[in-house]
Amino acid sequence: MSEFLLIVHVLAAATWIGASVLTGFAGPRMAREGGPAALGWARVSREASLKVFNPAAGLTALSGILLVVLGDDYDWSDSFVTIGLTVVVITGIIGSVVHRPDAQKIIAALESSDYPTATEAGKRAAIWGALTIALLIVTVSVMVMKTGAG
């Protein structure tokens, strides 16, 4: 069971990070295209948060928790477990407080041709997105190294 959970954990984290990197790469390029391309990308990104990011993050957290609860290899006192859970909480807050409202703001601004507002919100989303990616990369690193494992 623990091997299956570990596979699920790794695949979910890879999906989460991969989608984040793709969004960080494609988002600014689509924004520079402007008009319908930028609006289409903004809508796809908002939908991806509900259908890709949130499920991948949730599955990463759930499978990680189950690895600790059901297995003997990991413990709540392991630093990498604490770091992983902390990053899930932090990125959840970033998603709720920054990404979700900014996505709505970008879409509304693009729909009304308010490009300065869309650009400002897009830059803010890009900065917080880069921070999220950095947090996820650090988390994967401490997971692989099993930092602080008992």
Question: For each of these PLM feature ranges, what is it?
Answer:
Residues M1-G150:
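Polytopic transmembrane helical bundles with strong interfacial aromatic enrichment
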